[in-house]
Amino acid sequence: MPTAPIHARDLTPGQTRVSIAIIAVLFFIFGFVSWVNAILIPYFKIGCELTHFEAYLVTFAFYISYLVFSMPAAHLLKRTGFKRGMMIGFWVMAAGAFLFIPAAMTRTYGIFLGGLFTLGAGLAILQTAANPYITVLGPKETAARRISVMGICNKGAGILAPLVFAAVVFKVTDTDLFARLATMAPAEKAAALDELIRRVVMPYACVGTALLALGFLVRWSPLPEIDTEHETADVAEANADKTGILQFPHLILGALGIFLHVGASVISVDTIIPYAQSMGLPLLEAKAFPSYVLTAMICGYVTGILLIPRVVSQLTMLRFCTGLGVVLSVLIVTMRAPVSYGSHVTDISLWFVVLLGFANSLTWAGIWPLALDGLGRFTKVGASVMIMGLCGNAILPLGYGWLADHYSVRDAYWIILPCYLYLTYYALVGHKKRVW
């Protein structure tokens, strides 16, 4: 049986700091496993000979598991408690990592997708536990600041993930190899692609082993069981006649906001390599751009930590970020001008995609406390509904891929404009709705 939960206000300052540190490590792991998809997409596109649409099944397989497993994850956590549930989540992720081994040995894209789906299932359990945990681990007014710290850990791992993957898997001769693939005889090409794809065997064997070990570590960590569903007298009275989660409009609208936010975020990171390649940049140069997007996100998180709530409220920052997303979305598809920055010579629109990282940075942190406000005993189920919104990462990139195949990789960015328009609506009006 899980340990009896306690209220966050009953934790000592030391317990609170330890809890935040442990959750920060979890968010680092979330980021590393999630954002490595940015380099897996072009890698599988070459190694498994895929179209844009087929390549973006990477994000679909990974994130659709959030839709499938978030509700079961909430029920699992109720039965097991946070720590045992997190242990199970890590072990499910480990199984997904180990599936990469037979997938690579046979160069079977379907098995890779199965591994990604399983990794996502484990992450669904961990995210369902960690997000409400960090939200209630202190005053509601500073929740965005705590989530910003978690975001730095998440996106810091995301900066490292594609660079580490590229350093481990790619060789300096691969640019020449990629150029020669089109002229190779079928047997020679198959052998070259087999060798390329099998380079993931050792890295993912190590990842799987590490995830197994982390499951044991989190189970026996000093992380306390917190009551995330505590109701004050006012909340209990307001929710007395509530029988289900659909009776909280601000939550449902917030979950839709999460769906659109994460979809737009993953598009900005996972499509920027192909977009850079469309401008003539080789893969080994373009691989740096996801890290630039995530660096812009971290700049946004640091801004939030410094300014919220002392200078501006988390709601004001949410409104600023969503409005900035609208402006950048329009500029990406309408502005055309060559620009040289650092060692890169590209179109200016590529840097507008990079700046989307800043626009995306405080949106997640702003939506969560607004959507969970006043849920009381419905908090765990509400959190699982919010996590289900992460399937936006699965669906919107497929829409981008379809548009890229039928129009262009630049015009496909029109798909994110309605996302930011809705998020602006939620920041201004939608979060206030308490009745349908």
What are these language model-derived features?
Residues V18-I46, A130-N131, A161, S268-A276:
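Extracytoplasmic
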Residues V68-G110:
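Conserved MFS/SLC helix-loop-helix module at the cytosolic interface between two early adjacent transmembrane helices
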Residues I125-P139, S361-G376:
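Intracellular juxtamembrane helix-capping segments at the cytosolic ends
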Residues W91-T106, G323-G342:
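C-terminal ends and interior cores of transmembrane alpha-helices
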Residues L57-H75, S291-G304:
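Central cavity-lining transmembrane alpha-helices of secondary-active solute carriers
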Residues N37-I41, P162, A166-F170, T243-S291:
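Extracytoplasmic gate region of multi-pass secondary transporters
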Residues T142-D174, A383-L396:
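Glycine-rich segments within core transmembrane alpha-helices of 12-TM secondary carriers
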Residues F69-F82, G300-Q314, A404:
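Helix-to-loop junctions at the C-terminal end of transmembrane segments
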